[in-house]
Amino acid sequence: MDRFELIETIKCRGAVIFGTGFAAGMFMQILKERKLDGRVRYFMETAKSRETFYDLPVYSLDEAPLEQGGDPPLICAAVHDAIAGQIMPVLEKRYGSRAVWVYPMLSRLAFGDTIYTGDISVRDVIAAQPAENRWITVRYAALCGYRAAKDRGEVVSAYLKASAGDPDIGRRIYIKTQSRFSRPRTAEERLKRLWRISDDIASCGWKADPVLLDTDMRVIDGLHRLALAVYFGIGSINCELAKPSALYDSLFTGKNRITPAAQTDAGLTEKEIVFLDSMRSCLATRAEEGRKEHEKR
């Protein structure tokens, strides 16, 4: 099912959304923009964690109402790919072809088809990000912390110096900040996936899907890929560009972008905030080094 068929099916049959994290909220915002939020009947989770989400009831998988008669609604799994492998077999066993994984469609649903594809300097993408945002820095720091036990060199040394004897600080900040808009379990799985990908790159070389930006250089999808590209000294990265959308700021709030206010809300200590500031400088420096290395080739 592609995104066009998905929307038409929801218009006709309605939807139940599985998930109550960032992806589910993003999907609901997209449906609201299309005036289809009224077609959503309720939300589901594996184990119920709240009573309502977007003013609709939340049920556990075992407590969800049985649909009777007519065309039952789609079961739209709005979950990150880090946990989709665990979730989708359960939904498909219970709901068959009604279960659809919508996460891969979200960016295209929100921003439409891309208007450009090509390589863009990683340094330029990093430099274009607002100074207050720490969402790439947080991923980069967590990656450096993991690689510190495996690699040597200036990148790891800079991380260890910034960590001031606390090598776990990058992982800890990642979980704290990501858990503000995703389930802690999802945050943990996403981080483990980032680490696994870094191991693959270290063993087999660079390979990654394109990063999705808008023409204002705002990141839509690919924050982990950018962090990986900076760490491994990749000078330019394949990118797809979409037209800017008014949805951007409502989809990617301060919590997602990890602004100063979001850092405080996530419970970061003064030490952790100072560390992030230091790592932002390390990120910019390493991105510039990657550009220079690329130009020499």
Predicted feature descriptions by range:
Residues 165-220:
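Short alpha-helix boundary/capping and kink motifs at helix termini
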Residues 54-59, 113-118, 251-259:
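Short, surface-exposed amphipathic charged segments that create phosphate/polyanion-binding patches used
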Residues 1-108:
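Hydrophobic, well-ordered beta-alpha structural blocks that scaffold small-molecule cofactor pockets
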Residues 245-295:
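Amphipathic, charge-rich alpha-helical segments that serve as recognition/docking helices
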Residues 215-233:
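A sequence-level detector for short glycine-anchored, His/Arg-bearing signature motifs
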Residues 73-76, 201, 222, 229:
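A residue-level signal for conserved active-site and pocket-lining positions in enzyme catalytic cores
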Residues 237-240:
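Short hydrophobic alpha-helical runs that function as membrane-insertion/retention elements
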Residues 79, 97-189, 280, 284-288, ...:
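An acidic, glycine-rich, mixed-charge low-complexity segment common to nucleic-acid enzymes
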